[in-house]
A protein has these predicted regions:
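Low-complexity basic/metal-binding stretches
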Residues: 2-5
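Short beta-strand-centered segments that line the small-molecule binding cleft or hinge
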Residues: 117
Length: 322
């Protein structure tokens, strides 16, 4: 009996060592389509992690909303069933709206450099602290994305052309309010549902960066890319704190450093792809149509007044002046 107890004890001691040898699977979800800049960079992340962890960590990527829209994925990352989320606008606009809605205000952000100055600097720290406290989502990095453009089946030059047009926008208050004030009939909808809605005529148009217009094949259902360039933003990478806190220190370092590298690679791919995407969309039958930007900017000039009571005091002005 004594020998049996000793064997059992030895087995119990060996168990953690055996468990440690099993590769940890990391699931990363995102709505950006397969083959785009974000997806290519996610593939690099998987390779970097496998190499640096010597196979102890493996990454499975789920592009194109395979794990649901961004609303669903926020919950999954919070619970730890998805370990890493690679998000567009939904996350900060809904979870930390006091800051996120400001960044989603049309024509507030002047350029990609302006955006990065805000989100990579001290102004954004309270936003990331709130993200962690409210939902257990740890901010890691931002990757670039192209400007958002409106796609439709008839050319749009000024807001007057939008009257009565049914537009899909993300599930974000500032987006909904902006397009309503421009005269459109707004339908918030998760991205994976948009292609079918366009094909069936449930909606007349949508707005997204060129990458998502291409990878979601919207050129099969839309004729015009109207060059509104109304939002300049990025993709945010967050990890589940519930999962991350349980990683050994060396694996935490590998994951964090590889995610930052992933975003720098994505920035490069995105810059390279932007002009290529324009050519591909034109080849797919789309016309790139200039708009009268000043008519959109002036029509939306009062939008911040609708929301400023909800926003973090002084944040809008600080972004404007940065």
């Amino acid at each position: 009996a004594g020998r049996g107890r000793a064997t059992a004890a030895a087995g119990a001691l060996a168990a953690p060592a055996i468990l440690a040898q099993q590769p940890r699977a990391i699931r990363m979800g995102y709505v950006m389509g397969a083959g785009g800049a974000a997806d290519k960079a996610a593939g690099d992340f998987a390779r970097i992690v496998a190499e640096r962890s010597k196979g102890a960590l493996t990454v499975q990527n789920f592009p194109g909303g395979q794990l649901g829209g961004e609303r669903d994925m926020v919950e999954s990352v919070q619970l730890g069933s998805i370990q890493i989320g690679f998000f567009g606008s939904y996350l900060i606009g809904n979870i930390v709206p006091e800051w996120g809605q400001v960044l989603d205000t049309p024509y507030l952000i002047r350029s990609q450099d302006h955006f990065r100055k805000i989100v990579d600097g001290p102004l954004a720290k309270p936003m990331y602290d709130a993200l962690l406290q409210r939902k257990g989502l740890r901010h890691v990095a931002w990757c670039n994305r192209g400007p958002r453009y409106l796609t439709t089946n008839r050319a749009v030059t000024t807001p007057a052309d939008l009257r009565g047009m049914k537009l899909r926008v993300p599930e974000l208050e500032t987006y909904v309010a902006a397009w309503r004030s421009l005269g459109a009939v707004v339908t918030p909808m998760a991205l994976p549902e948009v292609f079918l809605a366009l094909k069936q005529g449930t909606i007349d148009g949508q707005e997204n960066p060129l990458e998502l217009i291409f990878t979601n094949s919207f050129f099969e259902a839309q004729k015009f890319v109207n060059l509104t360039g109304h939002i300049r933003s990025g993709y945010e990478v967050v990890v589940s704190e519930r999962w991350f806190s349980g990683l050994p220190a060396d694996q935490k370092t590998i994951v964090m450093e590889a995610l930052v590298e992933m975003c720098r690679l994505e920035d490069k791919y995105q810059a390279e792809d932007e002009s290529v995407l324009e050519q591909k969309l034109k080849a797919g039958g789309m016309t790139f149509h200039p708009v009268r930007l000043e008519t959109f900017q002036s029509a939306l000039a009062d939008l911040p007044k609708q929301f400023e009571r909800k926003w973090a005091p002084g944040f809008h002005d600080a972004v404007l002046k940065a």
